[in-house]
């Protein structure tokens, strides 16, 4: 049985880890290298590193910061933000990332996923999808540019297209739940796992061990990602894993 993964997320803005609510109101959390090391000591399964302002400010991801983090941690590292080309992917993988995450650029040009998968293998290519529930259309809508821009695209449809293009994994964030600590969007992740056959990392809304238990008992996602609860010490990775083990969910 495949074990479920618990993944802290480092949202990095100008070299500092930040965390906001619904993608705004950013608070400073600290130095990414120190925080990454702390998560490694806690037994996190992987780490996601997102340069949250890279795409919006049209600059490359902070390769030096990625290198510094990769030198200190030995768990798989996924890096995203500002990736516009295969050359950008190569630079990050060379800097120590195990996987690269594409969001806005892939929506604009899905062939980037294909090119990356052909060069580095599907397992290294993650499509990140930020989505909001659109009640009047009865669907999840894709957003880009760090959640600032809505796109006329159904998130479930885009998930299928991204996988067909070459994504070996999806990192899906509920913008409605992000930072609220009110629980994962179970409906979203149920729809996604029914639609695609690749591993899905669920993001947005984690607030308690119960939220992780519900995520893994009510959906078939592969991983749960969180930032706020871990950064501010409300929960530790071992506490989450203990609760999951008690609920008979397989974890490392």
UniProtKB/Swiss-Prot annotation:
Q: Which Pfam families match?
A: His_biosynth
- Which pathway does it take part in? Amino-acid biosynthesis; L-histidine biosynthesis; L-histidine from 5-phospho-alpha-D-ribose 1-diphosphate: step 5/9
Q: Which GO terms describe its molecular function?
A: imidazoleglycerol-phosphate synthase activity; lyase activity
Q: Which GO terms describe its cellular component?
A: cytoplasm
Catalytic positions?
11, 130
Q: Which residues form a coiled coil?
A: none
Enzyme class comes to lyase
Query: What coarse category fits the chief subcellular location reported for this protein?
Result: cytoplasm
Write down the chemical reaction(s) this protein catalyses: 5-[(5-phospho-1-deoxy-D-ribulos-1-ylimino)methylamino]-1-(5-phospho-beta-D-ribosyl)imidazole-4-carboxamide + L-glutamine = D-erythro-1-(imidazol-4-yl)glycerol 3-phosphate + 5-amino-1-(5-phospho-beta-D-ribosyl)imidazole-4-carboxamide + L-glutamate + H(+)
The UniProt keyword set, sorted, is: Amino-acid biosynthesis, Cytoplasm, Histidine biosynthesis, Lyase
Asked if the keyword Cytoplasm belongs to this entry, the reply reads yes
**Keyword presence, Transmembrane:** no
Q: Give the enzyme's EC designation.
A: 4.3.2.10
Compartments annotated for it: namely:
Cytoplasm
A Gene Ontology annotation in the biological process aspect, one of them, is:
L-histidine biosynthetic process
Query: Which family does the entry's similarity section mention?
Result: Belongs to the HisA/HisF family.
The protein's role, per its UniProt record: IGPS catalyzes the conversion of PRFAR and glutamine to IGP, AICAR and glutamate. The HisF subunit catalyzes the cyclization activity that produces IGP and AICAR from PRFAR using the ammonia provided by the HisH subunit.
Q: How does it assemble?
A: Heterodimer of HisH and HisF.
Official protein name in the record:
Imidazole glycerol phosphate synthase subunit HisF
């Amino acid at each position: 049985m495949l074990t479920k993964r618990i993944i802290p997320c480092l949202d990095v803005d100008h070299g500092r880890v930040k965390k906001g609510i619904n993608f705004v109101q950013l608070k400073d959390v600290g130095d990414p290298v120190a925080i990454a090391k702390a998560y490694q000591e806690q037994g996190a399964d992987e780490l996601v590193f997102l340069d949250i302002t890279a795409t919006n400010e049209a600059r490359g991801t902070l390769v030096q910061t990625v290198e510094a983090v990769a030198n200190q941690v030995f768990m798989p590292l996924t890096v995203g933000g500002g990736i516009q080309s295969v050359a950008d992917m190569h630079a990050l993988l060379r800097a120590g990332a195990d996987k690269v995450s594409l969001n806005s650029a892939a929506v604009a040009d899905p062939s980037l996923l294909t090119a990356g998968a052909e060069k580095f293998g599907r397992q290294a290519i993650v499509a990140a999808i930020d989505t909001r529930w659109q009640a009047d259309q009865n669907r999840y809508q894709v957003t880009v540019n760090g959640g600032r821009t809505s796109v006329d695209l159904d998130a479930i449809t885009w998930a299928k297209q991204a996988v067909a293009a070459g994504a070996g994994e999806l990192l899906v964030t509920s913008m409605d739940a992000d930072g609220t600590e009110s629980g994962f969007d179970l409906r979203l992740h149920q729809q996604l796992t029914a639609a695609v056959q690749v591993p899905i990392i669920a993001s947005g809304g984690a607030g308690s061990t119960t939220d992780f238990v519900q995520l893994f008992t009510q959906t078939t996602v592969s991983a749960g990602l969180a930032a706020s609860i871990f950064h501010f010490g409300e929960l530790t990775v071992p506490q989450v894993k203990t609760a999951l083990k008690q609920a008979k969910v397989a974890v490392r």
